[in-house]
C-alpha cells in the first residue's frame, strides 16, 4: 500500500460519506464484492459493522475524514518491527537437501496429491464414510518433504490453479502445519496428527453446494452464512467416519476461530482455543489469501504476512511469530527492491538470517529495463546489497516471477 493520506481507523469511527480504501482483514471475511467504495447508505454501513471487521483504511481525499487514525507509514513501521522481531527468534532447523532437488521432489508430490485428495472429497460428497486412515501415507510423504526442505513444498503448492484450489489447499495447509509444528517443537506422532489435521480441516466443504463452493464471484450474505457451516459439517463427517483423534477433530471444528472471540462457529477466545486450533487458523488464512481464487488473485506472500500482522485479535502472537520464521519475512516467490536499485525475486530462505535470503535480480529501477537475471546470496559477507522493501507484483507488469524464482521449469 503506497497511497499517501490513507489512514486506518476503528470501525466505530466509520461514517457515511467516507471512502473505504481497504478492509483490515481477509477478503474472505466481508460481504463486499469491492474493497474500495464510497459509503453511501445506512444499509452498507450496517453490513460493514455487522461483518465483524474491527478496523479499515479510509481515503480522506475521496470522502469524509475523521480526527485521529493511523497513517500508512506508522502502520508499516510497526509491522516491519514486528516481523523483524519474529525473524530474530531462534529456529534451529537445518535444510537437509538442496533447494532445486527438494523443489523437483515437491513438484512430483504436488502432482500425485491432487487426485488423491479429490477422491477423498468426492467420497465425502457422495455421503460415504470418510476413511481418514487412507490419508496417512500422503501425510507421511508431505511430512518427509517438509523435513527435507521446509520451503520447497510450501512454495510449490502456492502455484495451485483455480480449478484445483480446494484439494491443493488441503495439501498446502498440511505442509504449513507440519513446518509450523516443527518450529514450535512438536515431534513424533503429534506432528503427524498436525499434518492430518491440516489435510482434513476443510473436509466440510464437501457438504457445500458446488455452485456456492465454486462460485466465480463474491458470495451473497446467505451463501456466506451457509459456507460458515463447513467446520461443523466436517467435524460431523470425521466423527461419523471414526479413526481420527481429538487433535484432528479440534482443528477441523475451530480453525476459523480468532483469539479475540470474533471467529466462528463458537466465538471462542484465545484462552479457550488449543495450540493446534490456533496453528490451523494461521496456516489456513495464509494459504487462502496467497492463492488464486475463482474471483480474486492471491496476494504476494510478503504482502500477506504484512497484512496479517496488522489484524489485531485474529491470531495468537507467539504462533504468528513462529509462522513468520517458518515461511520467511520474504517468502520464496516474493518481489523485493534491493539497495542497489534493482528488483529481485526471492529464490530461497537463509534459515539463520531471514533478512538476507537468496534472490535473483532481474530489473533495473535506474534504467527501467530488464537486465540479465543474476543470483545473489544476500547473506554472503562479500555481498554489499540488501533488501530495502517488499514490492507488490500488482504494481509491475511481470508475469514470470515464479519461473524466475525457480518454482517452475524453464519454457
Question: What annotation goes with each model-predicted range?
Answer:
Residues 1-130, 388-411:
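Membrane-cytosol interface segments
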